[in-house]
């Protein structure tokens, strides 16, 4: 089990790295073209009761960056924090060359965890409650069945982990992947003895041998990284430059006096 200070300091280190990566991405955005959906803009303008182009650009940039933040944070957890803080073995491209992990049934497995007592657990990491759809749930059930039947020497059990939220909030797809049918009868095998689903606090506790405070320690590391990096001091200026460049690019094509010319914007983007 990892102790509090070990987790906090390690998470802080990788969170600092990630914060600098996000800053670098923002700097790169200044010289890139942001994709804008001209058909969506009138809806956003009306739905959010926006008053001018500046407010619309603020909304577009926030949405654009939020997608990158969410994706980047998922990679931070998956590729940096789990392997480097909690000692999991990430099934990267090199690891997947090793038998039996080169077989297709392991495609949705992200980590191998070898516990202190020698137990081998496989982790399929998911970002949230909506990550799994019906087709994937059925496919996961089939893949997990193959792993448990054909590679019992390589794994003792399988966990599907969701790093935020609660198990009660998950969709029924997380039951289906374990072989539990709710309502409609799907072609799945009961794997409830060997496949578990943990979300939120339960996931972080399971990861760290039952320590209930693990998620607080992870968050503490992130907060300490932010306090030290003070990213807002540079991000504010970069965001202002980004906004100014977007406004300048579209101002003549979207403004028609005091109103917005959506057809001019459509023509600029789509030709």
Predicted regions and their residues:
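Hydrophobic transmembrane alpha-helix bundles
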Residues: 1-21, 66, 132-148, 196-206
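Catalytic cores of nucleic-acid endonucleases
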Residues: 127-198
